[in-house]
């Protein structure tokens, strides 16, 4: 009995403590010409965790089911370019998504336009029937979309906001969106149309008194926190190009397995040793487990 107590006191042996742990992280890889990389090899990938290099064990295309919720600005700020620029850009983005992706659309009225798995042609017709006007309550739509994505439980869940920074919200609403992204494991992507880069805390569906806030800073922080993507379009004409980048990102996703150590996961960085490629590091399996 005494030797059991002594063994418990000293803890596990160094050999047991050093048993390697296998972790996995999602990585998007595409070229500067916005072509998804389809033949990535393990020897081209370098992974570090808290600045310590890790051994890459394998690289596989991420073919898990994907669902994308698109929130399109239908407010008065984009009225002049809504049908001419935004609708075609969103339709082309939908067409460019990986095969079998299920898509749902929301406006910033706020209102849901189409359900997941709906027909693209019918969705385009509904988008063009919208008369863009009024305020932009995109935060309400994004919260609703995140919650629905979470309930559906598909492995890969994305939300894409396309619109101006003239959003109306509340402190409660902005906090609720950040919380919903974490709780539902949804990855955010946003194309923010400038120069309208300041939203307002105001009345309407989100409530509260009028007060300006930094929309650019908010989306940048949310994208960083949840391993998403945030870009700024200098005009509505530039939206299509940024959405092509998002499509290349989603078509070029891999799951990278690497050797780690027991204990909390550190900050993971991934480099791809291939010329003219862009990389976005997504959430890891360990991070998703912590959120659950």
PLM features: what roles do these ranges have?
Residues 1-10:
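Sec-dependent N-terminal signal peptides
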Residues 11-292:
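Scaffold/interface architecture of coatomer-like assemblies
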